Regions:
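A contiguous pocket-lining binding segment that forms or flanks enzyme active sites
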Residues: 145-198
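A short acidic-Thr-Gly-centered motif at the start of a beta-strand
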Residues: 51-61
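Catalytic-site beta-strand/loop segments enriched in glycine and acidic/polar residues
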Residues: 122-153, 159-161
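A glycine-rich, hydrophobic loop/mini-helix early in the fold
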Residues: 76-132
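Two-metal-ion RNase H-like nuclease active-site motif
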Residues: 63-74
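Short, Lys/Arg-enriched N-terminal segments with co-localized hydrophobic residues
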Residues: 18-30
Length: 260
């Protein structure tokens, strides 16, 4: 899969290194945490103005849907992660391709900037794909973020495809706004509203299960994101199939890496 070229002003030093197939370490080794945070914040604020939470496609045209997830672990003083991307056929729900990439995490954890830790592995995994998904679904958030720049949204500017964020746990954007439980019926939802703006939805995919938290990534509307989440959820789980399979693959890959 060919990744979209992003104008240089939108790239931090570490992302430039990733795009050149170098290690993330070459881009961040000379930056302090405060310098990184300043650079990351600048990029988020620049990109947020380019978010398009509207449908740029027709559901009937979707053929391949990808699920993306990462799993972390530590070894000594180092932190590692594996990213897995699983592609399924939209009609048959059969797996058509899966790829993974393992690497060391070089960016320290900073609240609100998780995408910068995960993007290097996601981009390298996506570059391994032999087919091109029509839609990417991330185990995480998109618009449901203090600056609307969760991983699902941030990655869209590189993948140049519609993206959705589907999280299993609720992320309090402002540390005070909670969500209202949807009715106990499949397809029921409540909007997550912060300061009068809809950031996402709590969606119940099955009766008698916990809701998942849907937010647009980019190039898709919230209504369509919820419709697709329901279409891609099978009876075995309340999590949509693409990210459920990606989650399973990351756990398998992580255990294999730990034992090696």
């Amino acid at each position: 899969m060919n990744l979209t070229r992003i104008p240089q002003p939108f790239l931090t030093r570490f992302e430039t290194a990733v795009r050149q197939n170098n290690t993330c370490r070459k881009g961040v080794m000379n930056m302090t945490n405060s310098e990184m945070q300043e650079a990351f914040l600048k990029q988020q604020n620049e990109l947020r103005d380019k978010i398009e939470p509207v449908d740029k496609f027709e559901i009937r045209d979707l053929k391949l849907v990808a699920g993306v997830d990462l799993a972390y672990w530590t070894s000594g003083d180092d932190e590692y992660a594996v990213c897995c991307i699983v592609i399924i056929d939209m009609q048959t729900h059969q797996v058509t391709e899966k790829k993974q990439f393992l690497g060391r995490i070089e960016v320290p954890y900073m609240p609100g900037f998780l995408a910068f830790r995960e993007l290097p592995l996601i981009l390298k995994t996506a570059a391994l794909l032999e087919s091109t998904p029509d839609l990417f679904i991330f185990d995480g958030n998109g618009y449901l973020h203090p600056r609307h720049m969760g991983i699902a949204t941030h990655a869209s500017f590189y993948l140049n495809k519609p993206t959705i964020g589907i999280a299993k746990t609720y992320f309090r954007v402002d540390q005070k706004t909670d969500y209202t439980e949807p009715e106990n019926e499949a397809g029921s939802y409540t909007d997550i509203v912060i300061d009068g703006e809809v950031y996402g939805r709590a969606l119940r995919t099955h009766k008698d299960v916990k809701p998942v938290f849907i937010s647009v990534g980019n190039y898709i509307s919230l209504d369509t994101a919820c419709t697709l989440a329901l279409q891609l959820t099978e009876k075995e789980s309340h999590i949509p199939l693409p990210t459920r399979l990606a989650d399973l693959e990351t756990h398998i890959a992580r255990e294999a890496a730990r034992e090696s």
